[in-house]
Amino acid sequence: MKNILPPFIEIYRALIATPSISATEESLDQSNASLITLLAGWFSDLGFNVEVQPVPGTRNKFNMLASTGHGAGGLLLTGHTDTVPFDDGRWTRDPFTLTEHDNKLYGLGTADMKGFFAFILDALRDVDVTKLKKPLYILATADEETSMAGARYFSETTALRPDCAIIGEPTSLQPIRAHKGHISNVVRVLGQSGHSSDPARGVNAIELMHDAIGHIMQLRDSLKARYHYEAFTVPYPTLNLGHIHGGDASNRICACCELHMDIRPLPGMTLNDLNGLLNDALAPVSERWPGRLTVAELHPPIPGYECPPDHQLVEVVEKLLGTKTDVVNYCTEAPFMQTLCPTLVLGPGSINQAHQPDEYLETRFIKPTRELITQVVHHFCWH
């Protein structure tokens, strides 16, 4: 099997050269079909059964599941195929040309995270996958950078229940067993326009929003006081007011005001509970001004996530790497994979390179990442 696949660096080069940008703006958004075709071909060459799954509600996006072995359990290695858009003016290199310089591999997706599939393929090139005693699954998802539609759809529709999963996001090979969630909402207040010379003839949406913000700040303080998870650097749920806009002229009563806010819940906090707390906080404003205040999602919410600290996956990975698992504040697809099986986030490259111009992965990660993948496959699929 050694000669079936291109060399590691050529696999990496081909992945980076295949654009797969996800963006909410349609003009920037791209299908990942070409990248999925590449991956499907390579995993087929290694003897995997490959299924390509269209993801509903997306602009021609696909998941790919490569599987081998029979029976229950096994290991799932997973990652996303898409990247964020890039600012051409801030890149000093071609984002779609893999460039090696100063012990770094430069290119869009080198760290976050198309390169992870090159590591998987390279680690498996000399493995006879037909002889594995438990199943091995490779999942490539769509739209992680926007809606996480691929991971959501896969977790909702699959019957697979592996023993455990590893998501190869860039963690500098530091295993992550928990992270916060993310909820982003828009609060809209509808007033009544009028001339500013007679305020009583209108309803000023900015004034109503001022009242609403006061109640939201009380909720922020309540969340901070009620919920704690000491392992996080910020050990409580955060609430941020990120954007506000209202009105169109200084001499007009504001007819509409819109506030964008987010909450980052701790693991174990349900999205329904948080939505209930927000609605309860804003209830006094809604009761005083019926029909004038609404709350809606800006993006599909992401729950917090935690892998049980005493699970075998945590024990095995900590032993292999000689380091303890950690927790982080950013989000991944882990909450959706965790509904299927215990999941860790663990991969090469630094999260500090994610979404940055001149993104790179340090070559020092190449050898230990290959070894780690080989070891976890051996442990969970051969034993």
From Swiss-Prot:
- The entry's Zn(2+) 2-binding residues are D112, E145, H355
**Can you tell me which residues form the catalytic site?**
D82, E144
Describe which pathway this protein belongs to, using the record's wording: Amino-acid biosynthesis; L-arginine biosynthesis; L-ornithine from N(2)-acetyl-L-ornithine (linear): step 1/1
Q: How is the cofactor bound?
A: Binds 2 Zn(2+) or Co(2+) ions per subunit.
What would be one Gene Ontology cellular-component term for the protein? cytoplasm
Query: Which ranges of the sequence are coiled-coil?
Result: none
Localization of this protein: Cytoplasm
Q: What domain of life?
A: Bacteria
- State the PANTHER family in the record: ACETYLORNITHINE DEACETYLASE
**Role this protein plays:** Catalyzes the hydrolysis of the amide bond of N(2)-acetylated L-amino acids. Cleaves the acetyl group from N-acetyl-L-ornithine to form L-ornithine, an intermediate in L-arginine biosynthesis pathway, and a branchpoint in the synthesis of polyamines.
The cross-references to HAMAP family, in alphabetical order and at most eight, read: ArgE
- Please state which protein family the record places this protein in: Belongs to the peptidase M20A family. ArgE subfamily.
Q: What is this protein called?
A: Acetylornithine deacetylase
Q: What is the lineage of its organism?
A: Bacteria, Pseudomonadati, Pseudomonadota, Gammaproteobacteria, Enterobacterales
Chain's gene name: argE
